[in-house]
Amino acid sequence: MSAAPRIAIDAMGGDSGPAAMVAGVAKSYRRDSTLRFLVYGDERLIRPELAKHSSVEGKVDVIHTAEAIAATEKPSQAIRRAKTTSMGMAISAVKDGLADAAVSGGNTGALMAMSKLALRTMPGI
């Protein structure tokens, strides 16, 4: 049997931030209880949201970072700060083999630029 799928989550991305991302984690877990989550972002904002969803208790690791990519931030600026941001850390988790996939509701341009730099593209793409 293969290991449980691990999903890295940028909890600070999107208009609703951690509330929407943690609710999505809980919903995903209800659909597939083999999933495990690495949630990146401001722990002070994430923990209260996790407390609302007891079903994921023990299935989520929170990795704190106070830095996030703004929706208005240019991809070139975001790349320079990637290592210390929730989005950049989630992508790095995939690169480093800690996660199988990364999810972000944040700045799409920054996500694409950081992902392409960190993960490269598949052959032929």
Question: Locations of the language-model features?
Answer:
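A short alpha->loop->secondary-structure connector
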Residues: 119-125
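Contiguous, glycine/small-aliphatic-enriched amphipathic segments in soluble metabolic enzymes
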Residues: 1-117
